[in-house]
Structure formats: structure tokens, C-alpha cells
Amino acid sequence: MKNKRSQNSPYVTPNNPYLTLEKALGYSFKDKRLLEQALTHKSCKLALNNERLEFLGDAVLGLVIGELLYHKFYQYDEGKLSKLRASIVSAHGFTKLAKAIALQDYLRVSSSEEISNGREKPSILSSAFEALMAGVYLEAGLAKVRKIIQNLLNRAYKRLDLEHLFMDYKTALQELTQAQFCVIPTYQLLQEKGPDHHKEFEMALYIQDKMYATAKGKSKKEAEQQCAYQALQKLKEAK
């Protein structure tokens, strides 16, 4: 079992090896065992790992982020709010928030995961972030989680709006497929129709020669982003 912060690190104190993490988070755990559980991946083969906390954290974060978006984007309809939430409540979105507090440096993973750079994997890092937020919820309640998430969103995203996040789907998918399959997705133009001033493009997305999505858009780029969004949802459901 490995923890990246060595005892010689300036970030480690004898009484609290997680002091810097808690400062970045803006919350100090009363029960450090709960914090350690949230940071412990199942690969460690310990009696307590973060899987149960991850389950709770997923529900807590879905509610908190949904509420924040509901109040912030009063002009968005249900469809736009759902797309916006899906881009944040995802492995890519939670990994982005986790890296804002350098959570990867504190994960407890097995030696084999350490060798394969497991602490940087979106699946492991995002799950640990969900577990961490569940721990905060259990100790301090929903209001504290809400405050932490609001702060992290402001730090992790220069612009929190549908257009900006939507344009990040291709990047998110590429990072995920490289981590899971060691390949990047490919896009193919299926159809182009309409006059020059009103073109419509239909694109297909493939991962390892398997078609994952098709979508239409006013440009190839827009259609590719739609494809990437669909593929991300399929991979999330298959997790």
C-alpha cells in the first residue's frame, strides 16, 4: 500500500499527515479514520476501503451540484441543465475537482496500481473524490459540502457555462479512452447535406473500431462534440 506523501515531505506533520489536503479542502476531519477510508482504494485489500463512501458521495454530489446549477443558471431549461450537470458529475469532472486539491498525492493504492500510475486514473481519482465528499457530508452535513463544491468549481473552472464545458467533451473522452483502452477515439464524416449557408454534418465516433455514437451538427466540430458527449455517457453507464 502506497501513499505518495513520504514521511520526509514538508507537507507531512507527525500528528496529521493530511494537514495540507484539509487546508486545500477547507475542512478538517474530526475522525481521521473516516478520511483515511475515503482515500483508500479497494486494491489495497483492506477491511475498509472507499467503495461504500463513493456510493453515498455520488448521490450527495449529484444533489449539491444540481442545486447550484439550478440557482446559478435560471435561464437554462431542463435539457441544458442536465447536460451541464452531466459534464461535472462525471469521472472527468470529479477528477478536475480532485486535482484542484492535489487529491492524487494522498490516495492509498496498491503497489501494482502505483506502478501503473493508478493514482492518476480518472476512475480511481474521481471515486476517491466522491468518497471524500461523503465523509464531509457524514461529519458536517450538506451545507459544508455545498460550500466546498462552490469553492472548488470556482477554482477548477475559469468559466462555468454550458458552451465552455460542452466544448470540453472531446478532451474528456480522449483522456478517458487513453486511460481505459490506451487509444484515442476517431471521428468519421457520414453525411454532409444542405446549402452552403445552412449545412448539416453527421459524424460517427469510433473507439477501437467500434461505433459508439452518431450525431448531427451545423459544423463537423459541433457534431463531434455531440458524439463525444454520447460516448462519455455510454462509458459511464458501463462502468
UniProtKB/Swiss-Prot annotation:
Enzyme class: hydrolase
Domain RNase III as annotated: residue spans: 18-141
Catalytic activity: Endonucleolytic cleavage to 5'-phosphomonoester
Active site per the UniProt annotation: D58, E130
Compartments (UniProt record): Cytoplasm
SUPFAM superfamilies: dsRNA-binding domain-like, RNase III domain-like
InterPro entries to which the protein is assigned, alphabetical: dsRBD_dom, RNase_III, RNase_III_dom, RNase_III_sf
Molecular function terms, GO-annotated: double-stranded RNA binding; metal ion binding; ribonuclease III activity; rRNA binding
Matching Pfam families: dsrm, Ribonucleas_3_3
Enzyme Commission number: 3.1.26.3
First-listed, main subcellular location of the protein, grouped into a coarse class: cytoplasm
Entry GO CC: cytoplasm
This protein's record includes keyword GTP-binding: no
Binding site for Mg(2+): E54, S127, E130
Database matches in CDD domains: DSRM_RNAse_III_family, RIBOc
Gene3D superfamilies, per the entry: 3.30.160.20, Ribonuclease III domain (1.10.1520.10)
Annotated signal sequence range: none
Assembly, per entry: Homodimer.
Function: Digests double-stranded RNA. Involved in the processing of primary rRNA transcript to yield the immediate precursors to the large and small rRNAs (23S and 16S). Processes some mRNAs, and tRNAs when they are encoded in the rRNA operon. Processes pre-crRNA and tracrRNA of type II CRISPR loci if present in the organism.
Family: Belongs to the ribonuclease III family.
Protein's recorded name: Ribonuclease 3
Biological classification of the source: Bacteria, Pseudomonadati, Campylobacterota, Epsilonproteobacteria, Campylobacterales
Gene label: rnc
